[in-house]
Amino acid sequence: MPVNCQDAFYLTKYLRDTGSDIYCIDQFLSAYATPVLLDDCGFFVYFLNTVGENDTCIFLKDNRCSVQKAKATACKLYPFMVDPTEAGGFRFLYSREREHHFRGPLVETKNWMKKNFSQESRAFTQEEYAKAGSIGQYLRMIPENRKTEALMHFLRLRYSEYDLDFPFLEQFRRNQEKLLTILFRMAENETSSHKNEHF
């Protein structure tokens, strides 16, 4: 199950506030999630760890979610998925991967999303989608000998550098801008050095 930086923020906050030994997002990611490479440029995401032969979510205890109040966006929206559009809206997709899960009364997509896809989550998803292309582009321009440095900035500003006692979205926006500035400068320096080599 994917866990984005908004999910990591709220899951960490929930665990901290309910008596867990988890106090920061880095601890949460280390204990409960695994990074997965999304693109060869180095862009990675996190997925929640699983346990057992059936790859059960690490937070599922006795067939109940132990973090129900802070569960990941993908869990809240299931069996639907969200695909942001360039026009600023969303397409809602229906997962048919596990048909046996879908028994019971019919659900209207509009009502499901209104209940489970908050205004903050909508704003976050749109802004993350809008910036992801530029982040990937800059990462591709950065040479291998500086890629580790770039990815440390990526990890810090996408996932780690948050104060759990302040609103998430404002911090996310600030971190995104910082990350784009840093990666742009690293990519620009590489482009400039190549130009200088030709003179």
Could you say what each language-model-derived stretch is?
Residues 1-199:
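Short loop/turn segments that flank or connect secondary-structure elements
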